[in-house]
Amino acid sequence: MKKEDGEGNIRMKFKGRDFLTLMDYTNEEIDFILNTATDFKNKLAKREPHEQLRGRTLAMLFEKPSTRTRTSFQAAIAHLGAQSFYMTPQQTQLSRGEPIKDTARVIDRYCDGLVIRTFEQEKVEEYAKYMESPVVNALTDLTHPCQGLADMLTIKEKKGSLKGKKIAYAGDVWNVCHSLIIASSIMGMNIYVARPKGYDPNEKIMKFAEEKAEKSGAEIVITTDLHSAVKDADVVYANTWHSMGGPEKEKEKRIRDFKPYQINANILSEAKKDAIFMHCLPGYRGEEMTDEVIEGPQSAVWDQAENRMHTEKAVLALIIP
């Protein structure tokens, strides 16, 4: 079989599919998305046009504030030649009690896809249930698959491959952490999540990851020991201690509980000498990481932020019919 025939076969698997969680995608499919993102990144660097979705329309429904997700998606959609329509629930009849199933079916008649950033994973799934066009999860409280793709692309660029790489994660055990656990289990990375006792990953996420890890050879370790997590890590990943949409009333308690888990220069020095520092942003200097670390030579944070656009572009180009 010719290479282009094989590529065509896997490409056909994407058309019309939703992108709700990385759990719905195989190792081969995720790798194909990452390769597609790299192709788009190279085209953009060379100023080569890639308007694969010219004439398409995409709705963007955001219930949460956003900097990177909104800007990266709108830029990606523009580069692909499509039009995007940004909405909040307050600007729609959702604010007056219109059911999701009605809103979903109306959007479906106007647009070729929906990008949604919301709270409950169940909302994303309900839109997907009532829409024929693809639905993209741009963040829920449970998962953040678009961030997961950007993280994997960044690690692959900086480290050459994914399998066997050790990620030390320190921060809130929330959507980004869940997607990193899922990605690691599928792609064969080793992830060590360091957190205070009592802050544990979602049971459904862990059950999936443990089953996948048996096949991929990944190590999924949840620990209270930051030093063992960071030791010999290829990637040191910090995240906020009080995630957006999380229990804000617990903010002060979380700051106290997570204080021993700050990534500073001393902690980063315990990782491999060529380890990279990552953070999904927004970041709080002086809490989960120091200014010295995020602004230091090992920081890959800005490349990581840029890669949101390239990976989102790949997803949209692959799934929008």
Model-derived features with residue positions:
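Anion-binding alpha/beta catalytic cores of soluble intermediary-metabolism enzymes, centered on
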Residues: 2, 105-107, 112-183, 279
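Positively charged, low-complexity intrinsically disordered leader regions
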Residues: 6-71, 75, 143
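Active-site cofactor/substrate anionic-group-binding motifs, chiefly glycine-
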Residues: 57-110
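Glycine-rich phosphate/diphosphate-binding loop of Rossmann-like nucleotide-binding domains
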Residues: 63-76, 157-239
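Short, structured coil segments at secondary-structure junctions
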Residues: 80, 110, 130-131, 187, ...
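Rossmann-like adenosine-cofactor binding region
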Residues: 210-292
